[in-house]
UniProtKB/Swiss-Prot annotation:
<feature type="binding site">
    <location>
        <position position="96"/>
    </location>
    <ligand>
        <name>Fe cation</name>
    </ligand>
</feature>
<dbReference type="Pfam" id="PF13640">
    <property type="entry name" value="2OG-FeII_Oxy_3"/>
</dbReference>
<dbReference type="InterPro" id="IPR006620">
    <property type="entry name" value="Pro_4_hyd_alph"/>
</dbReference>
<dbReference type="InterPro" id="IPR023550">
    <property type="entry name" value="PKHD_hydroxylase"/>
</dbReference>
<feature type="binding site">
    <location>
        <position position="168"/>
    </location>
    <ligand>
        <name>2-oxoglutarate</name>
    </ligand>
</feature>
<dbReference type="GO" id="GO:0016706">
    <property type="term" value="F:2-oxoglutarate-dependent dioxygenase activity"/>
</dbReference>
<feature type="binding site">
    <location>
        <position position="98"/>
    </location>
    <ligand>
        <name>Fe cation</name>
    </ligand>
</feature>
<feature type="domain" description="Fe2OG dioxygenase">
    <location>
        <begin position="78"/>
        <end position="177"/>
    </location>
</feature>
<dbReference type="InterPro" id="IPR041097">
    <property type="entry name" value="PKHD_C"/>
</dbReference>
<keyword id="KW-0223">Dioxygenase</keyword>
<keyword id="KW-0408">Iron</keyword>
<dbReference type="Pfam" id="PF18331">
    <property type="entry name" value="PKHD_C"/>
</dbReference>
<dbReference type="GO" id="GO:0006879">
    <property type="term" value="P:intracellular iron ion homeostasis"/>
</dbReference>
<dbReference type="GO" id="GO:0031418">
    <property type="term" value="F:L-ascorbic acid binding"/>
</dbReference>
<keyword id="KW-0479">Metal-binding</keyword>
<dbReference type="InterPro" id="IPR005123">
    <property type="entry name" value="Oxoglu/Fe-dep_dioxygenase_dom"/>
</dbReference>
<dbReference type="GO" id="GO:0006974">
    <property type="term" value="P:DNA damage response"/>
</dbReference>
Length: 225
């Protein structure tokens, strides 16, 4: 399943990020890509050795960790270190699949269950640059407002179409979920959404408490901690 997570960053935060990223040191995006991806990747990434990168990636981690909808959809166990990329002048990233595991500075290794893109450029400011994801439900083309994030299974083939006008800047990361299975995670997310909707409409009740108990028992049964 694919999820749109709105408002991860405020407009003010997005403007500040863009201003700072204009001063960033950018390097060839293939430095973080395996052999297969390097054949189809043509973009730039912020140099991860810079002090600016360290500050901005911490802000992204704080923002997603504080976003309730992100937590409900991803049920994150481990977040990768966020990276930042830039596409311009017909740069693109052809169809590829993300690696199943990635190194992690604290945990050694992490499994990539979900991929996330946090858009930092207004969609009207550039042409092209759609994130195209192929999954069991078909093909999805994604171009979200700045500050919004999209979550999708890392097992999906995906690409970024050429940016033919303007500049597309984004942050991206991977998530190891407490729930490895996409279908189980989607069921928990739907159940959680319905519980929250019922609580806001009717207040607390024995029936809602029973559903909440069911949610946590399923999470307890399926989670890998």
């Amino acid at each position: 399943m694919m999820y749109h997570i709105p408002g991860v960053l405020s407009p003010q935060d997005v403007a500040r990020f863009r201003e700072q990223l204009e001063q960033a040191e950018w390097v060839d995006g293939r430095v973080t890509t395996g052999a297969q991806g390097a054949q189809v990747k043509n973009n730039q990434q912020v140099d991860t050795r810079s002090a600016l990168y360290a500050a901005l990636q911490n802000e992204v981690l704080n923002a997603v960790n504080q976003h309730a909808l992100f937590f409900a959809a991803a049920l994150p166990r481990t977040l990768s270190t966020p990276l930042f990329n830039r596409y311009q002048n017909n740069e693109t990233y052809g169809f590829h699949v993300d690696g199943a595991v990635r190194s992690h500075p604290q945990n050694g290794w992490m499994r990539t269950d979900l991929s996330a893109t946090l858009f930092l450029s207004d969609p009207e400011s550039y042409d092209g640059g759609e994130l195209v994801v192929n999954d069991t439900f078909g093909q999805h083309r994604v171009k979200l407002p700045a500050g919004d994030l999209v979550l999708y299974p890392s097992s999906s083939l995906h690409c970024v179409t050429p940016v033919t006008r303007g500049v597309r800047v984004a942050s991206f990361m991977w998530i190891q979920s407490m729930i490895r299975d996409d279908k189980k995670r989607a069921m928990l997310f739907e159940l959680d959404n319905n519980i929250q909707s019922l609580k806001s409409r009717y207040g607390e009740s024995e029936e809602i408490l029973s559903l909440l108990n069911l949610y946590h028992n399923l999470l307890r049964e399926w989670s890998e901690i």
